[in-house]
């Protein structure tokens, strides 16, 4: 990804797990991101989409698992995750929507 066309092309989805949910109290959020994106692009995309200030971005490449099917073996897609820490004093990101 040479240039950012749309920030929503970089941030694909939030990661919903026990571990990522526990980190929400510390203003740390986890997202599935485009595999070719870098930390700078992820930071700019988060700041544009959610209007927050990002302190740091850590990334992790997750290798796709080999899975057995009826006809042999297949492979799940490899993914990239970004662990985003918000700056102190920044408003929290509302991932799940406020109750009506």
Swiss-Prot record:
The UniProt keyword set, sorted, is: Ribonucleoprotein, Ribosomal protein, RNA-binding, rRNA-binding
Give the UniProt record's GO annotations in the biological process aspect.
translation
Check the record and name the Pfam families matching this protein: Ribosomal_L23
Question: Per its UniProt record, what Gene3D superfamilies does this chain match?
Answer: 3.30.70.330
Name the domain of life.
Answer: Bacteria
The answer to keyword Lyase applying to this record is no
GO cellular component entries:
ribonucleoprotein complex; ribosome
Gene Ontology MF terms: rRNA binding; structural constituent of ribosome
Q: Which InterPro entries match?
A: Nucleotide-bd_a/b_plait_sf, Ribosomal_uL23-like, Ribosomal_uL23/eL15/eS24_sf, Ribosomal_uL23_CS
- Described function: One of the early assembly proteins it binds 23S rRNA. One of the proteins that surrounds the polypeptide exit tunnel on the outside of the ribosome. Forms the main docking site for trigger factor binding to the ribosome.
How does this polypeptide assemble, per the annotation? Part of the 50S ribosomal subunit. Contacts protein L29, and trigger factor when it is bound to the ribosome.
Q: Which family does it belong to?
A: Belongs to the universal ribosomal protein uL23 family.
What is this protein called in UniProt? Large ribosomal subunit protein uL23
Q: Which organism is it from?
A: Mycobacterium marinum (strain ATCC BAA-535 / M)
């Amino acid at each position: 990804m040479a240039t950012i066309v749309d920030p929503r092309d970089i941030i694909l989805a939030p990661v919903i797990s026990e571990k990522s949910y526990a980190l929400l109290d510390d203003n740390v959020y986890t997202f599935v991101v485009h595999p070719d994106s870098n930390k700078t692009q992820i930071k700019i995309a988060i700041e544009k989409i959610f209007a927050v200030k990002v302190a740091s971005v850590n990334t992790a490449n997750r290798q796709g698992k080999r899975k057995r099917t009826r006809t042999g073996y297949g492979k799940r897609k490899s993914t990239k995750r970004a662990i985003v820490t918000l700056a102190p004093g920044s408003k929290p990101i509302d991932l799940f929507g406020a109750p009506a």
